[in-house]
């Protein structure tokens, strides 16, 4: 049993213990309380979870950010499930490992140091916590001759002066008492306070030998780190100009000590959760037994695992982490679901534990209470995904899971090629170096198995491997190049081969490494002129810092050296720039650079800016001569004038603000768990892909979204921008952030649009350019909606002038369709009527014409109804079209080059009842899968000759790969072999079924290519 020897008059609750710690430092010692950062790393891409109290202050120690206060105290939420700190595998088997835990800590940033830190710690332990110092041991750094660092005798003397006898002050080496952030950077000695839970087992001398020996009855309680050195790349150590203190004490262990418990799980942090499990599942009460403790130990271990995982899942989901984007979280969540179902026979148990977790932790972390329903919704969604995955799993898939149990964490229904890709990775990984999947292999995964970049990144995470994304993207570019006959079009319409473009990119990177950074703050200097209804962007005069002519660095260039003025590229780096470079999903600006013309001073030379890059803190303007002239001259140090294309910037700006309003409107209207997957902003349109749980967006929803945004535009709400630090951002609760995004420590731009009367609030971190007032957007409309995943929707929208153009196009089309409908009503049909309807329908579906989405859907329904009426008079003739279409197809695709047929019968759109058997009978010599779509109903039939049937390739399996996209039901005709022939029952689809059809056929094609 943990025993502090001095029995407290009253056992403190966990809440009181946490509050006592925080009050000790804030009230008694002038510290500032800083709330816990989310467990999602905010400014640190090096870790998957916040796993220590110091994570949010790492940049302060590195010197890249200012300290929020000189003295800080907090209780930090931490998660450890992988990497160096991996507690997942042992959770539940002992009394002190957890995936989620709290770290109590106090910090000094250049203020107090060793003596004050030790004194404050001992004061708390001996005073408010009433721990007998006779149960405490302390350690100090013994020094390291190799590093040339002496023993921390100062620390030894401090503890002596605070009343510790020398027998309780123990020296240890680097492994135990020297802290380092990394291979280089801040580091320093530490002192640890250990507590003896069983002092009756031996003398001080005997027990002292057990410190740092891995004993459960003598454990570390508090670690005080003194950051006073800096390790350099050559391994040498030097003193830091300012010294810091970083301390950490595990809250769960401290609570067990103060509540006189032998296990962290016996404290009031966990017992309410155990009670909730027992009451819901009606299982035997938790008894606290551990492995080797009999039959009860198995159940008790499950109690501990489920309680721990419920805390971890609740904390992560409340902080905005998503299982779909973090496989470690999904693994823990699914393990908790499995235990709930298989051990406690209660499939809703995990969601019932969330309110209990919130009750135990919500006072310290109010975001948990605020997000409680969202957490429950996310768990329910993940449970449904997991359930569907298991239910739809074939025998073959079950065998795969037995072979590769790790794949249980992946939604394989979204990517049928994942399993064979995983198998190939297992075979090939021994050939890879540095635990990195090479770019050419990544490209093979996408090309052969249909994996997306997102899915192969999940694959790499599953195997704890890295990906050579740079080489992969080069392979993708090379494939595009080959497809276009070794030529591809670059920005601005010029042609250059990939090798040249790569050389230019490498030269740009080398050039910018040696130059001073560009002042790019001028890109935010612009205003809106109401009279002209346009943006005013003042030109910027600045000096040239560096220059390339194609891939060659030059100090001076002139017209005579530019052999091909419309294709030769000039890369110019300037001291300042008002051009926006592509970032935050927003495309870069276009415009011109004006260069002095010494022959005609009033007519400067002009360079077209066709691209803008940001490299090594420099802005690179990629230019071409606007017109060929030998008189053109430009040298480093020359003054130039940068002119941004204001019209393009205005469209980009309006579309970026529109993207924020769209995101906010969806969250406001539907009150569902919503998260951003991706966004892109251009002068043509904006795209926003969102995860939206528990809601299927319909045509009427689109109209609601548009209406709300247009009312916000009419309300002329101001768009405000605030500059914040990361610490200031974390103090706010209502900011929309992109899950998994890593933000800088300083200079974060918070874009805020508030329309209280319309109950819409948009607060997003964003580096893009934005309108100054919503009225500048003029109007807004959604032009496309696509469901990209089980719970993901991609919106395409336009605003401003682009939206006005779309509405004008819609008005013209509405007028024409109205006239055609009048012809139907008066029976004044001509032979050209059907042709015109088909042309309109084709243009709406297959061209780049933009129309309001709701209008487009309504119009397609009207056209479909008119075409249906036309078909009634020619049904028999049209059925013959099917035979003609199939015979033509088979002639064009002979057996020797096309071992299988996968075909959508286009003429099926004209005939209400096409017997697909009629089509498959025409192809008896090879596997065939044919699809028809008529009156918004999709059907399919598959036949496989007996000679082609295998366990993995047969009619049922092949058709299933197609049907999954539509959630279609398949079955063999009565009395027939499902491996030889199979039908998909008709499924209703929208008028915009082409995208779904393309996706389904792509999966079926990949399946046949892989297994036939």
Curated annotation (Swiss-Prot):
Keywords: Aminoacyl-tRNA synthetase, ATP-binding, Ligase, Metal-binding, Mitochondrion, Nucleotide-binding, Protein biosynthesis, RNA-binding, Transit peptide, tRNA-binding, Zinc. Its EC number is 6.1.1.7. Residues 1-24 form a transit peptide. It catalyses: tRNA(Ala) + L-alanine + ATP = L-alanyl-tRNA(Ala) + AMP + diphosphate. Binds 1 zinc ion per subunit. GO terms for cellular component: mitochondrion. Zn(2+) binds at residues 656, 660, 766, 770. Its cofactor is Zn(2+). One of its GO terms (biological process) is alanyl-tRNA aminoacylation. It is found in: Mitochondrion. InterPro entries: aa-tRNA-synth_II/BPL/LPL, Ala-tRNA-lgiase_IIc, Ala-tRNA-ligase_IIc_anticod-bd, Ala-tRNA-synth_IIc_core, Ala-tRNA-synth_IIc_N, Ala-tRNA_ligase, Ala_tRNA_ligase_euk/bac, Thr/Ala-tRNA-synth_IIc_edit. One of its GO terms (molecular function) is tRNA binding. PROSITE patterns: AA_TRNA_LIGASE_II_ALA. Monomer. NCBIfam families: alaS. Catalyzes the attachment of alanine to tRNA(Ala) in a two-step reaction: alanine is first activated by ATP to form Ala-AMP and then transferred to the acceptor end of tRNA(Ala). Also edits incorrectly charged tRNA(Ala) via its editing domain. Consists of three domains; the N-terminal catalytic domain, the editing domain and the C-terminal C-Ala domain. The editing domain removes incorrectly charged amino acids, while the C-Ala domain, along with tRNA(Ala), serves as a bridge to cooperatively bring together the editing and aminoacylation centers thus stimulating deacylation of misacylated tRNAs. Belongs to the class-II aminoacyl-tRNA synthetase family. HAMAP family: Ala_tRNA_synth_B. This is Alanine--tRNA ligase, mitochondrial.
């Amino acid at each position: 049993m943990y025993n502090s020897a001095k029995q407290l008059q009253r056992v403190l609750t966990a809440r009181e213990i946490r509050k006592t710690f925080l009050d000790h430092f804030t009230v008694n010692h002038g510290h500032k309380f800083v709330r816990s950062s989310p467990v999602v790393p905010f400014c640190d891409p090096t870790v998957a979870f916040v796993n220590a109290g110091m994570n949010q202050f790492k940049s302060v120690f590195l010197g890249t950010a200012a300290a929020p206060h000189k003295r800080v105290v907090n209780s930090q939420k931490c998660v450890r499930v992988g990497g160096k700190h991996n507690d997942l595998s042992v959770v539940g088997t002992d009394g002190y490992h957890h995936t989620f835990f709290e770290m109590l800590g106090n910090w000094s940033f250049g203020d107090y140091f060793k003596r004050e830190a030790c004194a404050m710690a001992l004061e708390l332990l001996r005073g408010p916590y009433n721990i007998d110092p006779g149960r405490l041991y302390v350690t100090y750094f013994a020094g390291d001759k190799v590093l040339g660092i002496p023993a921390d005798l100062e620390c030894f003397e401090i503890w002596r002066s605070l009343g510790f006898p020398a027998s309780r002050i123990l020296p240890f080496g680097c492994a135990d008492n020297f802290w380092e952030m990394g291979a280089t950077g801040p580091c320093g000695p530490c002192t640890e306070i250990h507590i003896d839970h069983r002092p009756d087992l031996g003398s001080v001398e005997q027990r002292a030998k057990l410190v740092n020996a891995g004993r459960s009855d003598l454990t570390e309680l508090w670690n005080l780190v003194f950051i006073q050195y800096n390790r350099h790349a050559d391994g040498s150590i030097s003193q830091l100009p300012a010294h810091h203190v970083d301390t950490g004490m595990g809250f769960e262990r401290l609570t067990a000590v103060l509540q006189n418990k032998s296990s962290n799980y016996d404290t009031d942090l966990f017992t309410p959760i155990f009670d909730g499990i027992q009451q819901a599942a009606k299982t035997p009460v938790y008894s606290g037994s551990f492995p080797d403790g009999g039959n009860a130990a198995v159940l008790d271990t499950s109690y501990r695992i489920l309680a721990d995982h419920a805390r971890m899942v609740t904390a992560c989901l409340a902080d905005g982490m998503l299982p779909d984007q973090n496989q470690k979280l999904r693994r823990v969540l699914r393990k908790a679901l499995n235990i709930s179902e298989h051990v406690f026979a209660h499939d809703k148990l995990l969601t019932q534990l969330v309110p209990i977790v919130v009750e135990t932790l919500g006072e310290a972390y109010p975001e948990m209470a605020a997000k409680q329903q969202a957490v429950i919704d996310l768990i329910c969604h993940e449970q449904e995904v997991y359930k569907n995955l298991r239910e739809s799993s074939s025998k073959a898939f079950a065998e795969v899971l037995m072979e590769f149990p790790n794949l249980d964490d992946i939604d394989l229904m979204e990517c049928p090629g994942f399993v064979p890709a995983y198998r190939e990775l297992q075979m090939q990984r021994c050939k890879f170096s540095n635990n990195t999947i090479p770019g050419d292999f990544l490209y093979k995964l996408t090309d052969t198995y249909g994996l997306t970049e997102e899915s192969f990144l999940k694959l790499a995470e599953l195997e704890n491997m890295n990906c050579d994304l740079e080489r992969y993207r080069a392979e993708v570019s090379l494939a595009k190049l080959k497809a276009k006959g070794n030529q591809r079009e670059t920005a601005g319409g010029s042609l250059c081969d990939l090798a040249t473009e790569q050389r230019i990119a490498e030269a740009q990177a080398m050039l910018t490494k040696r130059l001073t950074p560009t002042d790019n703050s001028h890109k935010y200097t612009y205003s809106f002129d109401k009279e002209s209804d346009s943006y005013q962007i003042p030109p910027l005069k600045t000096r040239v810092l560096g220059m390339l002519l194609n891939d060659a660095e030059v100090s001076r260039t002139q017209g005579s050296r530019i052999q091909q003025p419309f294709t030769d590229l000039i890369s110019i780096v300037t001291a300042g720039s008002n051009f926006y470079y592509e970032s935050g999903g927003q495309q870069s600006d276009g415009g011109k650079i004006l260069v002095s013309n010494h022959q005609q001073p009033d007519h400067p030379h002009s360079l077209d800016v066709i691209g803008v890059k940001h490299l090594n803190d420099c802005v690179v303007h990629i230019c071409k001569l606007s017109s060929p002239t030998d008189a053109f001259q430009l040298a480093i140090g020359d003054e130039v004038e940068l002119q941004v294309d204001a019209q393009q910037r205005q469209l980009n700006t309006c579309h970026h603000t529109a993207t924020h309003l769209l995101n906010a409107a969806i969250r406001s209207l539907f009150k569902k768990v919503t998260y951003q997957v991706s966004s892109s902003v251009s002068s043509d349109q904006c795209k926003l892909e969102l995860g939206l749980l528990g809601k299927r967006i319909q045509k009427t929803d689109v109209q609601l979204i548009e209406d709300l945004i247009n009312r916000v535009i009419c309300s002329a709400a101001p768009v405000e921008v605030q500059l914040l630090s990361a610490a200031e951002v974390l103090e706010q609760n209502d900011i929309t952030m992109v899950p998994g995004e890593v933000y800088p420590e300083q200079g974060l731009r918070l874009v805020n649009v508030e329309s209280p009367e319309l109950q819409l609030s948009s607060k997003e971190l964003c580096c893009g350019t934005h309108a100054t007032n919503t009225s500048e957007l003029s109007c807004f409309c959604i032009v496309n909606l696509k469901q990209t995943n089980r719970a993901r929707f991609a919106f395409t929208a336009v605003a401003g002038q682009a939206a006005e153009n779309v509405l004008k196009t819609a008005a013209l089309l509405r007028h024409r369709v109205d006239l055609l409908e009048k012809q139907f009503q008066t029976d004044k049909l001509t032979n050209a009527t059907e042709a015109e309807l088909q042309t309109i329908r084709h243009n709406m579906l297959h061209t780049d014409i933009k129309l309001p989405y709701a209008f487009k859907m309504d119009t397609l329904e009207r056209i479909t109804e008119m075409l249906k009426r036309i078909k009634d008079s020619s049904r028999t003739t049209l059925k013959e079209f099917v035979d003609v279409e199939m015979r033509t197809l088979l002639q064009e695709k002979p057996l020797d080059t096309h071992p299988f047929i996968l075909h959508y019968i286009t003429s099926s759109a004209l005939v209400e009842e096409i017997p697909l058997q009629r089509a498959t009978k025409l192809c008896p010599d090879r596997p065939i899968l044919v699809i028809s779509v008529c009156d918004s109903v999709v059907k399919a039939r598959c036949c496989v000759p007996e000679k082609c049937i295998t366990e993995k390739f047969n009619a049922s399996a092949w058709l299933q790969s197609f049907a999954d996209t539509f959630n279609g039901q398949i079955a063999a005709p009565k009395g027939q072999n499902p491996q030889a022939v199979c039908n998909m029952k008709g499924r209703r689809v929208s008028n915009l079924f082409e995208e779904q059809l393309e996706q389904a056929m792509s999966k079926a094609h990949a399946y046949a290519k892989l297994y036939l």
